[in-house]
Amino acid sequence: MSNIPADLKYASTHEWVRDEGDGTFTVGISEHAQELLGDMVFVELPDVGDKVATGDDIAVAESVKAASDIYAPMTGEVVAINEDLEDAPETVNNDPYGDGWLFRIKADDSSELDNLLDANTYEASIDED
């Protein structure tokens, strides 16, 4: 069973979102997603300053099994990326909710967070898969 922290919000496409309390939101992929993908070999991240809209494919996680698009869970501007993943993409596997974060978005409208799933709803959605 995958670890699904209750303090995060989730997209149906397996991204997680953490509200940093300052108008920015950290985004990564769920433990469930990284388990499905397998060992990461490369993570292509957006550029700082990129304007993104909810649902845009803005990053790619490449594993030994497949390449998978990563989608923007909120509309806004990318304000930070996890540059450590360039040299250590396996961090996404080892610590998906911590050091394996992907990027941060300054949201245009933080109420978009309400459109995402809570941990229980996300867990129910992956149990159906």
Curated annotation (Swiss-Prot):
Q: InterPro entries per the record?
A: 2-oxoA_DH_lipoyl-BS (IPR003016), Biotin_lipoyl (IPR000089), GCV_H (IPR002930), GCV_H/Fam206 (IPR033753), GCV_H_sub (IPR017453), Single_hybrid_motif (IPR011053)
Describe its function: The glycine cleavage system catalyzes the degradation of glycine. The H protein shuttles the methylamine group of glycine from the P protein to the T protein.
Q: Which cofactor does it need?
A: (R)-lipoate
Which proteins does it associate with, and in what oligomeric form?
A: The glycine cleavage system is composed of four proteins: P, T, L and H.
Signal peptide range:
none
Which keywords appear in this protein's UniProt record, sorted alphabetically?
Answer: Lipoyl
PANTHER family reported for this sequence: GLYCINE CLEAVAGE SYSTEM H PROTEIN, GLYCINE CLEAVAGE SYSTEM H PROTEIN-RELATED
A GO BP term, please? Answer: glycine decarboxylation via glycine cleavage system
Question: What does the Swiss-Prot or TrEMBL cofactor note state?
Answer: Binds 1 lipoyl cofactor covalently.
Source organism lineage? Bacteria, Pseudomonadati, Pseudomonadota, Gammaproteobacteria, Alteromonadales
UniProt xrefs under HAMAP family: GcvH (MF_00272)
The protein's name is Glycine cleavage system H protein
- Family stated for the protein in its record: Belongs to the GcvH family.
Q: Which PROSITE patterns match?
A: BIOTINYL_LIPOYL, LIPOYL
Q: Which CDD domains match?
A: GCS_H
Question: How is this protein annotated for GO cellular component?
Answer: cytosol; glycine cleavage complex
The gene coding this protein? gcvH
- Keyword Thylakoid in the entry? The reply is no
The segment(s) forming the Lipoyl-binding domain are 24-106
Positions carrying N6-lipoyllysine are K65
Q: Which NCBIfam families match?
A: gcvH (TIGR00527), PRK01202.1 (NF002270)
**Record keywords: Transmembrane included?**
no
> In which domain of life is the source organism classified?
Bacteria
